[in-house]
Amino acid sequence: MAIDYSKEIETVNSITYEEFQENFYKPQIPVKIKNLLSDSRANAKWSPKFFKRHLSDLEVGVFDNNPELLDRSQKTAPHTMRFGDYIDMIEEKPTDARLHLFNVFKHMPDLVKDFEYPDIADRILKSLPFAFIGGEGSVARLHRDMDNSNVFLTEFWGRKKVVLFSP
């Protein structure tokens, strides 16, 4: 059965706690919230150039879409490289290389001061903030989050295509 990619996800510019809970969280309907962090310092300063300037020499694990590994879960990256080289690579040309479950806050703890967690949901898990960084052509394989979490996927630069499906 083919996946129908034509269903649009509702987009709002802002939303209250009550609106989010009643219209999206409780019925488990995805929503794009355009301005949730628009006033944050993170939105103003986080960019590939910013992270390269601060983390250029950091060795990072890099995942790809090796066809021999597509049928199994990968918890350890098959490649490593300097973060600065990775940023250069994804800005230069399309690539399937990506950083997955990269805890940038471990290396730059003060980044948590650049944003506030949204007040539209209860019990936001603040101890596991991860960055998913990839350039044009990178793909996160079909997966279910291991903790069955509801997540806030926040895009700071670039574009992302996301396919959601109900279990």
Show which residues each predicted segment covers.
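N-terminal accessory scaffold of Fe(II)-dependent oxygenases
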Residues: 1-167
